[in-house]
Structure formats: C-alpha cells, structure tokens
C-alpha cells in the first residue's frame, strides 16, 4: 500500500551529508548580534543609537497677550481684541470702513473743566467740547454713520488703567464703556465689517476673543506688571506676520547631518495602482461542482510621472480577514454547488505593498516619521459564469466595497527575482452598492466583494495621495545602505513554498481517479516516491535524506513515538482482568477516554467529544496495524506522489516541508470504523458517530461501552466510503450485502470497479477526498 512511505519515514534512517547540515543551520538557526561601533566609527552599519536630529516644531502656541506693537494703520482680524494703551491726551485711535462706520476715541485727562478742543480726525479738524471732573481718565467714543454727518459722543469709558479695546465680531464692532473696575462691552452695527481698518496712535496688544475674560480683566485692573517695565520694547506689527514658504509638492530635505550619516525627509506624490488576484478551482467529475473561489496576492508594475520625472512602481495587493461563503444546490452529482467562495466585507482589510525606483526607496532601512494621506476608491465586482454542462448557467454578479486609507508601515515585497523594502498601505473596507447575487439560485442581495471577478475587467484600480518619511542614509549619496537581514534564506524559502503550495492545490482537478486507486495499492518507497523528479540518483538520495530529517520532527512522527511509548508502558503493567473497567483502562492509551463510563454516556455531547478525540488517534493504530483494505493514508500518499510528478516547482529545499505538511494536512475530515459480526461502529473527526447493520444499513444505538471493548483488539478500518455515502448509494441505486461489506472494508478492487463504471456517487466521494488533499 502507498502509505508504506509514511511508515518508512517513521522507521528508517539515512546518512546525512555535511553539506545538508550546514545548509540547514544557515536556513533555520537565528542568532542575536549586538553591534556597538559608536556614532562615528568606520562601519557599514548605521549607528546603533541614532537620534532624530533637529526637529522643526510646527506647533503654534497662541499668546494670551501678544505685544506691545508700535502705532500703525492696519485692518484688524475678526475675533481678536485690539487692546490700546493710551499714554497721552488726544486721539487714541480712528476706525472706519468708508461706508457706514466712522469712529474715533479721544482721551481726556482728569480734572478738566468744560473746554473746546481741536482734534485731527480722518484728516479733518474737528472741535469737541470735553470735560472730566473725575480722578480717572475719560475716553470719549465719537461716532458718525455717514461722511456727511457730524460726530457725536456715543459712549464713554472712565478708566484709571488708561486701556481701551475694540473687537470685530459677529457683524458688529464691540468696545468697552462704563467705569472701571466695572466696565462692560457694548456694540455698534455695520453692514461692512470686514473692511473696517484702524489707525492706532499708541502702543497696543492683540488678544484672541477666546480670552475675552482676560481682556476684561486688563481693561478693569490693568496690565500684568511685566508689561510695565522699561525692558519691554514695542515691535512693528510686521514682526507678527509669518513669512509663508510653501513646501514643494515633491521635495527632499536634509534634516540633520553627522559625519557618515544624514537624515533625509522625502515628501512626494504617489499614485498606487493595484489589482486583485483570484484562484478558481473546479474539481473533476460531471462538471457541476466548484471547490474554491479565493483571493490571492497579485503583482502589478507600471510607470507614472512625478514632478516631471518618470517613476517605475511595483505593487503587490493582498487581502486579510476574508469571509467564507458556500452554496449547495443539493447532494446529487448533477446539483450545482460551490464548496467555498471568499468575500471581503467590513471586517476585512486590503494591503497594498508599494515600491518605486526613486531615491526615497533606495535606502529604506532606517525610517521614522512615516506618514501618508490617500484618497478612497470603490471596487466593483463583475460577472462570472458557472459553465455547467446542461441547463442555464448560474452567474455570480455584482458586489462592491470602498477602500479607505487606514495606515502605513514598512514591509518587504517579494517579486519573482528580488525582494524590495516597501511601504505597506493598509485599507479598511465599507460595503457599497450594488449587492451581489448568484443568478438562478437562492443566493441574492448579499453585500461585499466576492473573489469570482473582483477587477470587473479593469486592468487596475488607482489611488492617489501623498507620503512622507524620514530616512537615515549615508552622507555620501554614492554609498548604498546595507540591507541587513531584509532578505534571508528562510524568507526566500517561504516564497518558494507558497508558490509550490498554490501549484499543488491547483493540481487536484488533474488527478485521474482510476490511476489514483492503482497508485494507492503500490508499495511506494523512498525512491519510487521521488522517481518522477528529474534528477540524478544521487540527488534523489539526497532528497530522501532531507525528507527523512524533516519528517522526524513532524506531528505525525511525534504522535506515533508518544503512542508507542504509552502502549509499551501500559503493556508492562496491564491487568489480565476482562472487566469493562480494565478494557477502558487499556483503550485510554489510544483514546484518553475517561475511566468513568457513566460520565461518558451521560449525554450525546460527551459521546461526541470523546469520539472526536478517539478518531484522531485511530489513524495511528491503523498505520501501525495495517489491514488489507485501502486507507486514507494510501490515498494521501498516492495524491502526493501524483502531484510531485506533475509539479514544475519541486526543489530539494522545498520537498521536505511539502511532505511533512501533506502527512499532517491531507484529508483532515476522516472516518474510521470497527466491524463486529454484522454490526459496524463508525466515528469521524468531527465528533459524529454511527452504528448500523451491514445487511440493511439501518442505524442502531451506538454503545460506547461496546466500542471501547472492541477498539483495543479489533482492526481499525478507514471509512473511505463513509456511512452517509453508503446510505445514499443504497437508497438511490441499491447494493448487495457483498458489495456493502466490501465497501465497508474499503476493498480496493471493489472501489476500482465502481470508479471504472463511472458511478457518480462513488466518484463524487473520492473527488471530495482528493480535494481535501490541500496544503
């Protein structure tokens, strides 16, 4: 039987070349190395402790009291109080919009009897009668609404702090009036607030309206003491103006430089083009079944102009957080079904790894302050026809998601020939219209983007935006930063393994079942297993050696070793009693079944849990005590042999991993049975259990006590044709007792006869087993 290859891998040993040991150490061993050469040492490594260099702080802190500023004429901003510190009598300020607002404030010193005084206001000599009988200064707000009218005293502020204020806000001009320390604000209407300018004849300050309480405090109580010293020199208002220097759209800026290294900030536009990859697998058979429709990573290379310079870019698009859907139109071989198709929705993410040939990516090893800003894009699915042999074709159509930028990190992007240090842009998803459906089925009005046709005929999807990063690079631009450990032997091996896994999985539909049964009956050994590989005898031996070494560490080998030791210990101390309890104690070495049978039989859930545990270990017993019937491992080894022969990507360094994975992952859903007289007891890895009669295939109660007695001393048989398939076969076609008995025993000759007769139910069952041979 083909499963002999697994037993050989478990028991045989091969000589090991020194070259194999060295190669294994180089690919698997890791070591932490600390390099501490100092910041200026002559080394090809970057300084171990490198700082951020000079940082341009762009944080703006708005002062509460900004000033003092020298007398000037300007248009004050809205939402800011102008606080004027008057130091003499006469005109304090003039303000107008030349349409409906003219105002001037004149200061009158204390103890002034009524008197006519001349004032120069807006270029005109005006005479006002003023007086002040208090100990405080008076500030008279003179107002007119037209250039033809005369000024009149609209409001007065009596103050001992000699401060007045004016504010443009909410379509009105606000000033203070009353007497300090209880002065309050009042306002005047105007239809043209924005054009009001002011000529100030004294020093002044600027206070944001958000700090109006402080302005009120200053008006009523005076300025802080620090503002009243001779060391405070008023500045020109122009010093408050910021000289804006707009950064170039695409610009490289040197931030800091120390000897061998410098920090460069790269700011640039970016155009990201990407496409989704997908894989559609249709198994053999009558042509009504699809086993998988899935997303896979897709590369895309393109050119575009950035600031007049042509850039060559490379992207890799992948998805994470996929949702698995399925459609089952029935259990007959001619019923349309899709075992699994993938859909991305709100809980999914799309990753786009981006690299281009610009300077920013040349030395992308030591990077900080990585940021990006990208727009969103909508991805709409197209149509995919399920071309069934007879009848109207079902069609998967529609579906849409919108991608929204959610972050950026560094990544390593693998191409066919080289690994590139890249930027990984992460996008969150929201579902969008239209919904998707499978026409002529019950699947309608579902939301998300299915993997059947995610690009909808588009060559690519495009996202534009900007990115910025600071990179530590050599001061001499001719030097290349060493890319330490960005590409290792193991990473390259993982890429090869990924490609090989995809190829192996896609080969499932190319396996002819009649040839598979014949191959499963052959006693495959090391050299016949690998004979299909184009190589010399020496290389085949070397491959067998590598596979043997890898297989020794597999879960299967470890489980068999532990089971053998456990049985050996149990045999040396086992009681000769034939009671139920002693039988359960013996079976516990196989199954870990509880000693307390009553606890096991309390509920169906307990039985399900125990039978699931038992079934996973029955494989080991079947492997050690081979029966005449065909086993799941025979099919697994035959499929592995067939795929190795058909593969174009098998390498010496990838074969051991593939064989190990195949032994553990091929056919995860297995059923095993035990025969006693005319009764069959069957359990599977999903925890389901059946007991039935051979003659009628009618179910009978499943007796756990009886099962635990039988499993120790009775051969275990792989249920190649499981109970569900047997019932379907008998109900639709009818089978004799002899045929049923041979199918229950997994007789390979009977299986071959059914397959040669192209029996749809048996073929469908074997197809499902082949489809489970996936990595």
Swiss-Prot record:
Annotated site residue numbers, Cleavage: 230-231, 240-241, 246-247
Cellular component GO terms held in the UniProt record: host cell endoplasmic reticulum-Golgi intermediate compartment; host cell plasma membrane; host cell rough endoplasmic reticulum; host cytoskeleton; membrane; viral outer capsid
UniProt region (Spike head), positions on chain: 65-223
Entries under SUPFAM superfamilies matching the protein: Concanavalin A-like lectins/glucanases (SSF49899), VP4 membrane interaction domain (SSF111379)
Residue span of motif DGE motif: 307-309
Annotated region (Hydrophobic), positions in chain: 388-408
Gene Ontology biological process terms, A to Z: permeabilization of host organelle membrane involved in viral entry into host cell; virion attachment to host cell
InterPro entries in alphabetical order: ConA-like_dom_sf, Rota_A_VP4, Rota_VP4_MID, Rota_VP4_MID_sf, VP4_concanavalin-like, VP4_helical
UniProt keywords, alphabetically: Capsid protein, Coiled coil, Disulfide bond, Hemagglutinin, Host cell membrane, Host cytoplasm, Host cytoskeleton, Host endoplasmic reticulum, Host membrane, Host-virus interaction, Membrane, Outer capsid protein, Viral attachment to host cell, Viral penetration into host cytoplasm, Viral penetration via permeabilization of host membrane, Virion, Virus entry into host cell
Location of the region described as Spike foot in the Swiss-Prot/TrEMBL record: 509-775
Domain of life: Viruses
Residue segments, region Spike body and stalk (antigen domain): 247-478
Similarity remark: Belongs to the rotavirus VP4 family.
Note: In group A rotaviruses, VP4 defines the P serotype.
Record-given protein name: Outer capsid protein VP4
Species name: Rotavirus A (strain RVA/Human/United States/P/1974/G3P1A[8])
């Amino acid at each position: 039987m083909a499963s002999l290859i697994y037993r050989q891998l478990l028991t045989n040993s091969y000589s090991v070349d020194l070259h194999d040991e060295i190669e294994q150490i180089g690919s698997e061993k890791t070591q932490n190395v600390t390099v501490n050469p100092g910041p200026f040492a002559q080394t090809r490594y970057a300084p171990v402790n490198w700082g951020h260099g000079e940082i341009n702080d762009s944080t703006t802190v708005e002062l509460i009291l900004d000033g003092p500023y020298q007398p000037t004429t300007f248009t004050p901003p809205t939402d800011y109080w102008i606080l004027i510190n008057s130091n003499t009598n006469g005109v304090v300020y003039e303000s107008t919009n030349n349409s409906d607002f003219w105002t001037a404030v004149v200061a009158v010193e204390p103890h002034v009897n009524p008197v006519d005084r001349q004032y120069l206001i807006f270029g005109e000599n005006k005479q006002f009668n003023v007086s002040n009988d208090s100990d405080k200064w008076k500030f008279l707000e003179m107002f007119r609404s037209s250039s033809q009218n005369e000024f009149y005293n609209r409001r007065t502020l009596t103050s001992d702090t000699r401060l007045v204020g004016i504010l443009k806000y909410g379509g009105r001009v606000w000033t203070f009036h009353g007497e300090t320390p209880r002065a309050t604000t009042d306002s005047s209407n105007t239809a043209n607030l924005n054009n009001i300018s002011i000529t100030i004849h004294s020093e002044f300050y600027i206070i944001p309206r958000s700090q109006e309480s402080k302005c009120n405090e200053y008006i009523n109580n005076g300025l802080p003491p620090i503002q009243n010293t001779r060391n405070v020199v008023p500045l020109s208002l122009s010093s408050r103006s910021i000289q804006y220097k707009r950064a170039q759209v695409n610009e490289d800026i040197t931030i800091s430089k120390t000897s061998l290294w410098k920090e460069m900030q790269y700011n640039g536009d970016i155009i990201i083009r990407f496409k989704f990859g997908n894989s559609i697998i249709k198994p053999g058979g009558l042509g009504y079944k699809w086993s998988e429709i899935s997303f896979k990573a897709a590369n895309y290379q393109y050119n575009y102009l950035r600031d007049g310079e042509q850039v060559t870019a490379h992207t890799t698009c992948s998805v994470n957080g996929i949702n698995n859907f399925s459609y089952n139109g029935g259990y007959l071989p001619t019923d349309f079904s899709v075992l699994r198709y993938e859909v991305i929705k709100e809980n999914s993410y799309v990753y786009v790894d981006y690299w281009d040939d610009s300077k920013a990516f040349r030395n992308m090893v030591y990077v900080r302050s990585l940021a990006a800003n990208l727009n969103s894009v909508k991805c709409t699915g197209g149509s995919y026809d399920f071309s069934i042999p007879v009848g109207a074709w079902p069609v998967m159509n529609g579906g849409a998601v919108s991608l929204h930028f959610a972050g950026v990190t560094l990544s390593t992007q693998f191409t066919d020939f080289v690994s590139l240090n890249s930027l990984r842009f992460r996008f969150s998803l929201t579902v969008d219209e239209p919904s998707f459906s499978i026409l002529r089925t019950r699947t309608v009005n579902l939301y998300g983007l299915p993997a059947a046709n995610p690009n909808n005929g588009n060559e690519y999807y495009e996202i534009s935006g900007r990115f910025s990063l600071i990179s530590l690079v050599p001061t001499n631009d001719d030097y290349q930063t060493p890319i330490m450990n960005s590409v290792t032997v193991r990473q390259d091996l993982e890429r090869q393994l990924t490609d090989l896994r995809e190829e192996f999985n896609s080969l499932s539909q190319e396996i002819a079942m009649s040839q598979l049964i014949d191959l499963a009956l052959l006693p495959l050994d090391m050299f016949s297993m690998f004979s299909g590989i184009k190589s010399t005898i020496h290389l085949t031996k070397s491959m067998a050696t590598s596979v043997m070494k890898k297989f020794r560490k597999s879960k299967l080998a470890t489980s068999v070793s532990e089971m053998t030791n456990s049985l050996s210990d149990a045999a040396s101390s086992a009681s000769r009693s034939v009671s139920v309890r002693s039988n359960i104690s013996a079976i516990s070495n196989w199954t870990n079944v509880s000693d307390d049978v009553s606890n096991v039989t309390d509920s169906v859930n307990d039985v399900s849990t125990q039978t699931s545990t038992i079934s996973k270990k029955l494989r080991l017993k079947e492997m050690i005590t081979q029966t005449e019937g065909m086993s799941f491992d025979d099919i697994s080894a035959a499929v592995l042999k067939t795929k190795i022969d058909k593969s174009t990507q098998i390498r010496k360094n990838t074969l051991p991993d593939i064989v190990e994975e195949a032994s553990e992952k091929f056919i995860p859903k297995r059923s095993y049975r035990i025969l006693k007289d005319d009764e069959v007891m069957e359990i599977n890895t999903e925890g389901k259990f059946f007991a039935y009669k051979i003659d009628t295939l009618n179910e009978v109660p499943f007796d756990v006590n009886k099962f635990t007695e039988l499993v120790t001393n009775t051969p275990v048989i792989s249920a190649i044709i499981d109970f569900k398939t047997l019932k379907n076969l008998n109900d639709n076609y009818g089978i004799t007792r002899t045929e049923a008995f041979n199918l229950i025993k997994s007789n390979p000759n009977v299986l071959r006869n059914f397959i040669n007769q192209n029996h749809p139910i048996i073929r469908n069952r074997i197809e499902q087993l082949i489809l489970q041979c996936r990595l």
